[in-house]
């Protein structure tokens, strides 16, 4: 790569939001919903120059006339045509760059299928003509962003949660655990418990309102049962929220009942272990000699770890599971909503990383499988 002065692009494609920007920046320039919308009825608005598809915020604002699709489900790309539209939108509309002029760092979910990494690589080189690219595991980037190379990352976004033990910069694939319980499920659960109180939230538009209620008012209780009793005996925990139409609703124990599902998935009718137990199970799958380093470096990452109280609760629950002498430390960086992107920004701007890029020449020589040799 001769372009020393060319800024690399960093794109973190999440199930719910896409975060994109320039390597070396401390925050993403563009954050928009990972959605593609297509008109439900064609040609109603004659002469309006109606597009055949909309991406991100524009799709969100026109959702009344569109069918919305999320091309990334549970962290894994399932619809490549729509994914290509999202990348196109990222380059040309959000960042306003020519992809053929910049190296591109993409992120992937832990345990992403091999065929998927190849497809990402192929699209970048063949559709967008990028000069160079790289694919990095999301949780590893979050760990880098926290200034560590060893630790266990509990990454929870909109579509999926993972616990990823990392030793000296390498994820340990045999010990990675996936939990299909994340932000979207918590929003759905909040809709359900608010409906039980007599408020009706059903449409996709109303779901966005509930997501906002969740993000602004929900928190994790340190002791769930005690908190339930406090909520029942006083109004100290009640908060009011004004809906877009001016109606004011009051929310009480829903504030902490909603995120409690992270620790007790049975609330959602799921039989899986909670995030604390999943973290513990991940650690127990690792070599006994590195467990101490993992317990002492539990890094929270992703938007669904933004609830107040989550770190203290995680500490309490892990302490109960771990050997009694073990020192446990939960790291919850304030910017953890974007720590995957930030880690990518750091990585792509390191001088030592510059030889790691897959160049167009290497791709033309070896084809998409080059990604398994160079990105691990």
From Swiss-Prot:
Entry keyword set: ATP-binding, Cytoplasm, Cytoskeleton, Hydrolase, Nucleotide-binding
UniProt entry tagged with the keyword ATP-binding: yes
One Gene Ontology biological process: mitotic cytokinesis
Subcellular location: Cytoplasm, Cytoskeleton
Catalyses which reaction(s): ATP + H2O = ADP + phosphate + H(+)
Chief place of localization: cytoplasm
Cellular component terms (Gene Ontology): actin cytoskeleton; actin filament; cell cortex; cell leading edge; cell pole; cell-cell junction; cortical actin cytoskeleton; early phagosome
Keyword Transmembrane belongs to the record: no
GO terms for MF: ATP binding; hydrolase activity; myosin binding; structural constituent of cytoskeleton
Matching InterPro entries: Actin, Actin/actin-like_CS, Actin_CS, ATPase_NBD
Cited function: Actins are highly conserved proteins that are involved in various types of cell motility and are ubiquitously expressed in all eukaryotic cells. Multiple isoforms are involved in various cellular functions such as cytoskeleton structure, cell mobility, chromosome movement and muscle contraction.
Family recorded in the similarity comment: Belongs to the actin family.
Name recorded for this polypeptide: Actin-10
Upper lineage: Eukaryota, Amoebozoa, Evosea, Eumycetozoa, Dictyostelia
Gene that encodes it: act10
